[in-house]
Amino acid sequence: MKVAISDDFLLAFSDVQKTHQKKVREFIELFRENPEAGGIQYHPVRKARDPNLYSVRIDQAYRAIVFHPADTDLYLLTWVDHHDDAYAWAERKVFRVNPMTGALQVLAADAVEAAEAAVIVSKKAAPARKAGLFRKVKDDVLLRFGVPVELVPTVRAIDDEEGLEESREALPQEAYEALYLLAAGYDADTVLRELEKPMEPVAADPTDFTTALQNDDSKRRFVVVSDAKELAELLNAPLDLWRVFLHPKQRKLVSVAANGPYRVLGGAGTGKTVVALHRAKHLVETVFPASTDRILFTTFTRNLATDIHENLKTLCGPELLSRIEVVNLDAWVSNFLKARGYRFEPVFDGEGNELWENALALAPPETGLSSDFYRQEWDEVIQPQGLSSLDEYLKAPRLGRGTKIGRAAREAAWPVFREYRSQLTERGKREYIDMIRDARQLIEKQGIRLPYKAVVVDEAQDMSAEAFRLIRALVPAGPSDIFLVGDAHQRIYRYRATLGKCGIDIRGRARKLRLNYRTTDEIRRFAVTLLEGRPIDDLDGGLDDQQGYMSLTHGPKVEVHRLKSLADETAFLGRHVKDLIASGAAPESICIVGRTKHVVEHVKDALRAASLDLYEVKREATDKRSRPGVRVATMHRVKGLEFDHVLVASANDKIIPLEKAMKAGDDVVVARNAETGERALLYVALTRAKKSAVVSGWGAMSPFLG
């Protein structure tokens, strides 16, 4: 017998009253063991349009709805609810195998009947109407995209994008996505490739529901439950659908048999991190299954590493998780070097500033070079290239620098850099990029063999070239060795790198995710305009764009509130959060974001003044959803998180962009990059929102807001 659970069932289970969940859970466990057990009584749903739907009694209040085709051993748990509500749900649904795609689809019975009735009416008299949105698309193409034959008339009646949105609930998800892309101007072949559809038509048996469950589109909404452990994991976190249900394109990337490093790009909300998490699980479970095999999952910040580890705990069992090491790269380097007697410690900003002041005392005034120039030259030229002598500096390219200097100026400037390096050494200090370089050189010179079979990298856009060289040294070159996901539109740190120049060859192994499943189109559009006209790299020497990057949901436009004073903003924040909660939003689904810690303190004061509970998501701490309260965090901290509602507070001039971050002296290139980074930070903050985004400020507002 084959038992499966739908995504709808899990969502419905999460809404079951706590006093009944234990009873429902006991029923599900019994059902998985044997759906034909004597204690399970099946009752046909009398008014159901689908004869394969049955009601099963759980207790006096609750009923489960089961799809069980006659003469099969297939049992699908599709819904759970109070008695009358469960029956009403079953009466509204029909289950079909799409003969053109092979997917098991759940359709609204009313929509099917309405479409069939419309065909009858249209045959009697065809009233004049506007040309349809899909008038140029043939029926067989619509069917190949997953449009049920019964709903082709519904699609033909769609006149514009608003009509398409109104028809969304009636259509299978894969059909809606294809129609959305067609409406956006993509040709049929491009849509087939983007959605991982076969280029040739598929002939499927419409009565074979068991085979249909294996279809990639079916796996977006149904999961076959094979054992009690897997079932328990599902029921423990029924709302974490990302753990089980993947888009076919995501599923393909997760299991790709890569003959070397692989790179995945994608805008905010396209599921890059979800792909990386599932990829790590796939690697230890399938590609490198030996008990001694290890995978390194790394990212740029401790915050993200903490969040990733928490997510992997929900995705992997203890045995698999024990073979995935999750750590941000700087921490890995520190641990690696410390274990080998490394005598240097990382230098932090306060110490570094003092050392720079000492070194700048050697700067010759005749060159006219500012103190900002020296620090930027160090960060942009000397450190990325690992320059350690004047001779190397004289020969080094200075790509990306706006201030031109000749040989004489380089010779005059070098003593400053040499002195800064000398002072670091005297105090037993190194910058992190030096430590990364030292770790790589130690591995290469001593031939150290590390236990890792593969490395998975999240937020790759924030890694430096030296970091990528180290990553290349961590694992031997071979199939499925390195898997990177990133998006340079979300680069909020200064590093840039070209993978190919770091020994990571991704030629022929690079893909892009374009469908945003998190953010509404209104939020996406607002965020995208922040970076329009700015060249964004693809991590490998080329340019990336957001062509085809689109959201499949809609909602309210982003609101910008320009208040007169700090007191006015304080009152507004409290009032707006209360309005969201009154409309049904959970406080934990709301996050107020600030550019600086000072702004975060202002937000906390505003929430306290409104008598609202709050929970600050701090650095190196996870967002524990069990903790009550409106979330408050810095822009940097919310990277990698998501919320239903996001408010960006104090979007004032000199705060966004932050005045300190914009200091670039006379270097126009550094200034442009700094502004792009500040714009990217606001882009990241806004795209954490799933349903609504609001920006507020007082006095002079951020120039980014127009």
Language model segments and positions:
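Accessory N-terminal region flanking or inserted into the helicase ATPase core
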Residues: 209-248, 255, 262-265, 369-453
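Basic, Lys/Arg-enriched alpha-helical interface segments
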Residues: 1-62, 68-215, 397-400
